[in-house]
């Protein structure tokens, strides 16, 4: 049983904790919180031991919460650490704590690529993470782009260049201090946005440029993609490649999927925890082939898309399971769509 310690229990961390707990070969050794708030109560109710930073122990005790120990205790009690801290905090934790221990650590996409030896996406480069000490699961948008490109390349559809235009959600649902509320903000105004270079940390040879704006929604990101392929492929061949790749979902307008909100409503109706949708949701009707040009639109659920990637990263760094076996196990335990998918 792999003991997984999770540093951070926010939007991503709490989802990773639940996902790890659902795996038959993993156990949540504990979670780390820096604030003694309601999320501590949630973690405790789920049976997770709660740790904190050394300088926060007394604050927890004053709030009537006895922590299981400090971050160093959590590291000692774990075979691998997943750091789901806010942006840049993971790098600080690496310097202060992780560097003292010979334990693998998995960071999130909010950290700079230099924090790790490998930037990770399960479909694209699972085996590159084997035996590594520091691995970084790329961000939600980068994960979405990488999955789409890899789904084509795994099925023999070559990509000469990719141009992706991103409408980013302004904030996560619980982030009441963020926006915009009534605006569209270049994010950034310069070209490329950071997503393209980030994709290249995984897919080294891809020719990609990205642009992004932030919009006043909280549900999902929307990507509009133009891909130049290495030849003229039938639309059916492209759709087949997408349909049989794990963690890709084809949404049909004729079935009622006319917006991203309906994708999330579908997840809720399915009874998925928190209404999460870890798959990339590609609008089938948008998939258009014109010679060697491919156009498509797809949604990325920023709160959950990286969760299965973190689970697979645990097995990858420890060499615990082959790539496709891990991906299939993760998808099955998290109840993602597996029918018609090819694992291998």
UniProtKB/Swiss-Prot annotation:
Subcellular localization(s) per the UniProt record: Cytoplasm
Main subcellular location of this protein, as a coarse class: cytoplasm
Active site: 140 (nucleophile)
Keywords: Cytoplasm, Glycolysis, NAD, NADP, Oxidoreductase
GO molecular function: 4-hydroxy-tetrahydrodipicolinate reductase; glyceraldehyde-3-phosphate dehydrogenase (NAD+) (phosphorylating) activity; glyceraldehyde-3-phosphate dehydrogenase (NADP+) (phosphorylating) activity; NAD binding; NADP binding
Chain sites annotated for binding NAD(+): 11-12, 110, 169, 302
Lineage: superkingdom: Archaea
Pfam families: DapB_N, Gp_dh_C
Any single biological process term in GO: lysine biosynthetic process via diaminopimelate
The keyword Nuclease is assigned to this record: no
Annotated pathway: Carbohydrate degradation; glycolysis; pyruvate from D-glyceraldehyde 3-phosphate: step 1/5
Binding site for D-glyceraldehyde 3-phosphate: 139-141, 195-196
Enzyme class: oxidoreductase
Gene Ontology CC, one term: cytoplasm
Annotated EC: 1.2.1.59
Catalyses which reaction(s): D-glyceraldehyde 3-phosphate + phosphate + NADP(+) = (2R)-3-phospho-glyceroyl phosphate + NADPH + H(+); D-glyceraldehyde 3-phosphate + phosphate + NAD(+) = (2R)-3-phospho-glyceroyl phosphate + NADH + H(+)
NCBIfam families: GAPDH-II_archae, PRK04207.1
Subunit (UniProt): Homotetramer.
Family: Belongs to the glyceraldehyde-3-phosphate dehydrogenase family.
Protein's name according to its UniProt entry: Glyceraldehyde-3-phosphate dehydrogenase
């Amino acid at each position: 049983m792999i003991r997984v310690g999770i540093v951070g229990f926010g939007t991503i961390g709490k989802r990773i904790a639940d996902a790890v707990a659902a795996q038959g070969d993993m156990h949540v050794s504990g979670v780390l919180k820096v604030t003694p708030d309601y999320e501590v109560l949630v973690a405790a109710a789920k049976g997770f031991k709660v740790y904190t930073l050394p300088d926060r122990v007394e604050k927890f005790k004053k709030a009537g919460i006895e922590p299981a120990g400090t971050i160093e205790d959590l590291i000692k009690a774990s075979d691998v650490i997943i750091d789901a801290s806010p942006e840049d905090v993971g790098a600080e934790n690496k310097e202060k704590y992780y560097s003292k221990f010979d334990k693998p650590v998995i960071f999130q996409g909010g950290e700079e690529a230099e924090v790790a030896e490998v930037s990770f996406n399960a479909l694209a480069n699972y085996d590159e993470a084997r035996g590594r000490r520091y691995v970084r699961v790329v961000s939600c948008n980068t994960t979405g782009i990488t999955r789409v490109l890899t789904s084509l390349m795994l099925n023999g559809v070559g990509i000469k260049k990719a141009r992706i235009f991103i409408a980013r959600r302004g904030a996560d649902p619980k982030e009441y201090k963020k926006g915009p509320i009534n605006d569209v903000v270049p994010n950034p105004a310069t070209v490329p946005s950071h997503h393209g270079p980030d994709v290249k940390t995984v897919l080294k040879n891809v020719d990609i440029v990205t642009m992004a704006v932030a919009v006043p929604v909280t549900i999902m990101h929307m990507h509009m993609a133009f891909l130049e392929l290495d030849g003229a492929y039938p639309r059916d061949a492209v759709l087949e490649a997408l349909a049989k790749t794990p963690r890709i979902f084809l949404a049909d307008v004729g079935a009622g999927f006319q917006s991203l909100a309906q994708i999330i409503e579908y997840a809720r109706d399915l009874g998925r925890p928190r209404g999460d949708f870890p798959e990339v949701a590609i609008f089938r009707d948008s998939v258009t082939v014109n010679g060697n040009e491919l156009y498509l639109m797809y949604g990325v659920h920023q709160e959950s898309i990286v969760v299965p990637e973190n689970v697979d990263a645990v097995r990858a760094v420890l060499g615990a399971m082959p790539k496709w076996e891990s991906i299939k196990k993760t998808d099955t335990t998290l109840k993602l769509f597996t029918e018609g998918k090819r694992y291998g």
